[in-house]
């Protein structure tokens, strides 16, 4: 009998670190993208919590009229927000060391830029980490591709839109009421409800919710019975078991009779591809729509498109929406503008008869 002894090669500290970072045996996979993701998301989260609680008012419009957003300055969970960086800063990179003091940095909304840039870097790295773990496990890359939809949406409202409008002050505030304010002002200035890419996004989100509910209810309703009629069907299964617990043929037959034969899937892979692709493609289109409207390529304008034989306007829903848009635009940033852009750009009517 011959014993073969091999000398174990001593791994350097860097080598052990690399093995630990890329190990799929860890309880939570870190990965090289995680090395950047963890500090950026921790920074964004920490600054968000501190600023949401205690940040002083921010001069968002750059006109020396600070807006309060934190809890300690009179807000609640609904009205509170991280106020976007001041219009006086524009698109300038504004870290703490660029300000004369921390007070000035806070007054100009420095925390918003810090949170947004770290957050976007962090979620992009999370997407890369999904791909990295899939790669190391020999999986296909579509999980990261699906996650690219919310990443694209966040990038559109927090980065692309401010770039197109020329200032981080036009970015979406980080709060509940601030989000609604952003949506209302966006509609007023860009008529997003009349943009086909937004319509595709609505179809994607609502359709995805509908298909998810339909799929989940069908699967949980078409169990393969492993028990008798006298005991619960749940007794026939173990959590996490390898064997399938439902019959796709039965679900296909049920749904085919409920609507019509070709409205249901009899192939599990094509079904789940559809469930993933529908909302993802819809959200991609919405992000693309926000990114085009950032540069003022706005929704369709059908205002005053129907007139009678005398040339009088017959209002359509497009005119009703336009009237609402003008009202919203008049009311936002009241002290920063004398007139909304749509009204100020029209020639004054003749008054000499």
UniProtKB/Swiss-Prot annotation:
Per UniProt, the keywords (alphabetical) are: Acetylation, Calcium, Chlorophyll, Chloroplast, Chromophore, Electron transport, Herbicide resistance, Iron, Magnesium, Manganese, Membrane, Metal-binding, Oxidoreductase, Phosphoprotein, Photosynthesis, Photosystem II, Plastid, Thylakoid, Transmembrane, Transmembrane helix, Transport
Q: Name one GO biological process term.
A: photosynthetic electron transport in photosystem II
Residues excised as propeptide: 345-353
User: DNA repair as a keyword?
Assistant: no
Q: Which InterPro entries match?
A: D1/D2 (IPR055266), Photo_II_D1/D2_sf (IPR036854), Photo_RC_L/M (IPR000484), Photo_RC_L/M_CS (IPR055265), PSII_D1 (IPR005867)
Question: Which PROSITE patterns does this entry report, sorted A to Z?
Answer: REACTION_CENTER
Q: Which GO terms describe its molecular function?
A: chlorophyll binding; electron transporter, transferring electrons within the cyclic electron transport pathway of photosynthesis activity; iron ion binding; oxidoreductase activity, acting on diphenols and related substances as donors, oxygen as acceptor; oxygen evolving activity
The annotated subunit structure for this chain is: PSII is composed of 1 copy each of membrane proteins PsbA, PsbB, PsbC, PsbD, PsbE, PsbF, PsbH, PsbI, PsbJ, PsbK, PsbL, PsbM, PsbT, PsbX, PsbY, PsbZ, Psb30/Ycf12, at least 3 peripheral proteins of the oxygen-evolving complex and a large number of cofactors. It forms dimeric complexes.
Note the HAMAP family from the entry.
PSII_PsbA_D1 (MF_01379)
Output this protein's name: Photosystem II protein D1
Organism annotation: Phalaenopsis aphrodite subsp. formosana (Moth orchid)
